[in-house]
Swiss-Prot record:
Keywords: FAD, Flavoprotein, Magnesium, Metal-binding, Thiamine pyrophosphate, Transferase. This is Acetolactate synthase, catabolic. Mg(2+) binds at D447. SUPFAM superfamilies: DHS-like NAD/FAD-binding domain (SSF52467), Thiamin diphosphate-binding fold (THDP-binding) (SSF52518). It comes from the Bacteria. NCBIfam families: acolac_catab (TIGR02418), PRK08617.1 (NF006378). CDD domains: TPP_ALS (cd02010), TPP_PYR_POX_like (cd07035). It comes from Klebsiella pneumoniae. FAD binds at residues 159, 263-284, 304-323. Pathway: Polyol metabolism; (R,R)-butane-2,3-diol biosynthesis; (R,R)-butane-2,3-diol from pyruvate: step 1/3. The gene is budB. Its EC number is 2.2.1.6. The lineage of its organism: Bacteria, Pseudomonadati, Pseudomonadota, Gammaproteobacteria, Enterobacterales. One of its GO terms (biological process) is L-valine biosynthetic process. It catalyses: 2 pyruvate + H(+) = (2S)-2-acetolactate + CO2. It holds the Pfam family TPP_enzyme_C.
Amino acid sequence: MDKQYPVRQWAHGADLVVSQLEAQGVRQVFGIPGAKIDKVFDSLLDSSIRIIPVRHEANAAFMAAAVGRITGKAGVALVTSGPGCSNLITGMATANSEGDPVVALGGAVKRADKAKQVHQSMDTVAMFSPVTKYAIEVTAPDALAEVVSNAFRAAEQGRPGSAFVSLPQDVVDGPVSGKVLPASGAPQMGAAPDDAIDQVAKLIAQAKNPIFLLGLMASQPENSKALRRLLETSHIPVTSTYQAAGAVNQDNFSRFAGRVGLFNNQAGDRLLQLADLVICIGYSPVEYEPAMWNSGNATLVHIDVLPAYEERNYTPDVELVGDIAGTLNKLAQNIDHRLVLSPQAAEILRDRQHQRELLDRRGAQLNQFALHPLRIVRAMQDIVNSDVTLTVDMGSFHIWIARYLYTFRARQVMISNGQQTMGVALPWAIGAWLVNPERKVVSVSGDGGFLQSSMELETAVRLKANVLHLIWVDNGYNMVAIQEEKKYQRLSGVEFGPMDFKAYAESFGAKGFAVESAEALEPTLRAAMDVDGPAVVAIPVDYRDNPLLMGQLHLSQIL
């Protein structure tokens, strides 16, 4: 490989940066140019890499994160100095919390100007260090390839996340001597030690009420395949965080207690409280706080690529650290009988199944207008088939969807819980579509979150992205409102005015739809799904039942 990339003289450091990106297999770069980084944009014109101009830097990071989550290879954002970098912060923090590999390259003032009060001077490394896995400035031109290569390694290995590289203007504009480094990828790990796997197999054999708790890393495709074999072998009940959506397939659906998160009141939560053995697979505490679900009465097993980050409510008794898929496959081989459910666990799963069937039969009969959230979820279930990718923003709708809409393909759903960032869904959808243009992407937001990234409709139209965006309209920040009402019995700062979302979408060149009656919901969604290109559907929603989400909600109370 060294002979393939000899040391050579580059007219500009930017040329070496771009060649290093090509060596990493980068297919597109999301960003906004500026004077401190425009030489890199110029060099990209002579490369195989596609430039995707965006309308806000945070959205560049969101789009790159979608590429990273779906492919496992870091997506790339490219921004200028000063506010170009500071605008990027939310996207990078979100990617880091959600485990999405992203590499961001940010322009910076010339090295000689770092200590001066000059235009757009900012200590971006200090700014990004707390919210990334890796943040560094290139201080010597001949280190360019090494720094960029290591940024990819940091972003992609272990639990993936974000990495930031600061590129001073004189480093990328000036000549440099160096060579491109071949992409080495993340190092291949082996399974956890055999004796530790044997120990967990014995714990499973002795347990009366074991349960698997799945986290984001369990939904990586190879891990998901191994998990499904383990579920079939063991017949152990399973629950998951929101981020692990799609890890459990339809064959194991009868043992799936649904997703858990935010409020401790789901079937999965009841099984966790009942459990004498909890096996966490690919889980990070940022996905669902251990204090919410860990009773302290169960033996706790941690299976992941990294040791557990311990806290008072998460101190595993056994840790299986290594390649997750390899570990799960070995564990499955060590299990010699299927679990017989305890009467209590069997009843919890039967009740969960009853509620699923109730929603399937009666969800479409909720005829009030504005629409009940379950009516919308039931209609969405019909359009989000296995070929559709779903991206979900943050808001009250996110809880209804996470609890009651089911998907069975690993990484089919992108949902945020680490930072609970508003505005992610539309840029995520654009990034996801670029990875798989043959797949329709459906994104969902509230009317609050939508306007935080709605300018990217122009990007979607320019790219002719086959993206359908659904807006649940209630003229307020409802998820905050229901919590304020519970805590203070009054509302503050959560109401805003209406707008014509159909006209707004059409002003960008997208196809706009507005649901104007309950009976129009399903026909409108079908018509919007038939659009070959960007489309937006505004759906008025009645959130009066949202306080029930924080209690022991049983669907028979509504349906």
